[in-house]
């Protein structure tokens, strides 16, 4: 797992515990980093014989054409490599969390805007360590089949043009689920 920040790190760390998925979620792979730095980590994972799952927010690409081009280049570069899964979310991973509760592809301008709507469904949600380090919020996201609903919703949105809010985190969940089932 390669990710951008604390929210992603804690989510995937707790998801592994809650769902019994098997993957490495090393804190050093989760920090604010550029797409170029992510590519270096992807290459390191591939050289080590692993599968690189890269989780990133795409909101920076709306206003920064250089970053937009870098994300596009990264996605294009690894498009045919089954060992690399790019799980970008527009505007942020909070949109992925929202899909656990709502079937929406509404355009959100920022992660803060998504978080405000998310708090209607998950009132305690905060982007700070004292909230994120507790497993309960991820357990709540996964309860009552909400994780699979989020996957279905995100998959349906992915069939549309990427002009609206979207999340490709479902690709990682599909991989984790497939690997878990193959071990049975």
Descriptions of predicted regions:
Residues 2, 55-57:
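Generic enzyme active-site microenvironment
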Residues 9-29, 39-51, 58-184:
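C-terminal accessory helical subdomains adjacent to catalytic cores in phosphodiester-
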């Amino acid at each position: 797992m390669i990710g951008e920040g604390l929210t992603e790190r804690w989510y995937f760390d707790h998801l592994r515990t809650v769902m019994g998925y098997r993957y490495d979620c090393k804190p050093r792979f989760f920090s604010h980093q550029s797409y170029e730095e992510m590519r270096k980590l992807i290459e390191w994972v591939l050289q080590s014989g692993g599968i690189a799952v890269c989780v990133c927010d795409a909101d920076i690409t709306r206003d920064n054409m250089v970053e937009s081009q870098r994300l596009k280049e990264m996605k294009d570069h690894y498009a045919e490599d089954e060992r690399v899964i790019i799980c970008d979310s527009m505007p942020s991973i909070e949109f992925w969390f929202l899909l656990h509760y709502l079937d929406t592809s509404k355009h959100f301008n920022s992660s803060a805007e998504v978080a405000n709507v998310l708090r209607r469904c998950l009132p305690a949600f905060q982007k700070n360590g004292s909230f994120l380090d507790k497993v309960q919020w991820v357990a709540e996201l996964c309860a009552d089949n909400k994780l699979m609903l989020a996957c279905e919703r995100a998959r349906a949105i992915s069939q549309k043009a990427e002009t609206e809010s979207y999340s490709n985190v479902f690709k990682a969940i599909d991989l984790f689920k497939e690997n878990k089932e193959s071990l049975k």
